[in-house]
A protein has these predicted regions:
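Short, extreme N-terminal leader segments that mark the start of a protein/domain
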Residues: 1-35
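Beta-rich nucleic-acid/ligand-interaction surfaces
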Residues: 43-56, 144-161
């Protein structure tokens, strides 16, 4: 399998990643909107290439608690994907999916099993939308694993894909 360094990736690669992101996020927004029964406003995805060591600080405070949905991909492409949500968005999405209304959440309120399952499904749909866009645009077969979910500090959650990246080299 071909591996590239950041120095070898040119503007064309970044444009391709942006286009895949546009298609994938559009499909994901439509799927999630249908699930929650409300319109989803999406921003145009941004693509930034950076060393893994800088990833934590790029997404926000490393000690902030976030929700991470992680899965591995295999077949024509081997790798992993992670979808991150802040706690407020996670509670909002879980409440919408489970049809809970007017719920006030404490800042560090723990998610119950049903809420975690609903959020895992959202992450599964979003990552599958991106993978589907990538597969259809490249004619590659890409198989996702069952997703895993974790609620922890951003630095702890991001250490999982970073460790996998360094052990696969």
């Amino acid at each position: 399998m071909t591996k590239y360094t950041l120095d070898e990736v040119n503007d064309m690669y970044v444009d391709v990643l942006k286009e895949i992101g546009n298609v994938g996020s559009g499909n994901a927004a439509t799927a999630i909107a249908n699930m929650v029964g409300t319109r989803i406003d999406m921003k145009v995805p941004n693509v930034k290439l950076m060393d893994v060591g800088k990833l934590g600080s790029a997404i926000g405070p490393e000690e902030e608690t976030v929700i991470g949905i992680f899965l591995e991909v295999s077949h024509d492409i081997d790798g992993s994907m992670m979808f991150l949500l802040d706690l407020e968005s996670g509670h909002y999405l879980a409440d919408k999916l489970l049809m809970k209304e007017n719920v006030v959440h404490e800042q560090m309120e723990v998610f119950d099993e049903m809420e975690l399952s609903a959020l895992k499904e959202v992450g599964n749909i979003i990552t599958a939308s991106y993978l589907s866009a990538l597969a259809s645009m490249t004619n590659l077969t890409i198989l996702p694993s069952v997703p895993y979910i974790c609620v922890d500090m951003a630095a702890a959650i991001l250490s999982v894909p970073a460790c996998l990246l360094y052990t696969s080299d």
